[in-house]
A protein has these predicted regions:
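N-terminal acidic leader/helix
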Residues: 1-25
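Low-complexity intrinsically disordered segments
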Residues: 27, 31, 36-67
């Protein structure tokens, strides 16, 4: 799975060390977005969709440092 620079930065900010934990944190973050923060909502939705397609083993290979 290919992630662009913005996606990787978002993932590093919210990384908990697990794929499902990261998805959960991104969903929580979305709850606090203002209606005009559409770019961040779209970015996080795209990351979540890509993360859903990864296995836990593939996620572990991304080498994202946990928060």
């Amino acid at each position: 799975m290919n992630f662009d620079h913005e996606e990787l930065m978002l993932m590093m900010l919210y990384n908990t060390g697990t794929r499902l934990g990261l998805i959960h944190e991104l969903r929580l973050m979305q709850c606090y977005l203002m209606p005009d923060e559409t770019a961040l909502r779209e970015l996080s939705e795209g990351v979540i969709e890509k993360l859903k397609l990864l296995t836990d083993a593939e996620f572990a290979e991304l080498e994202l440092p946990p928060d």
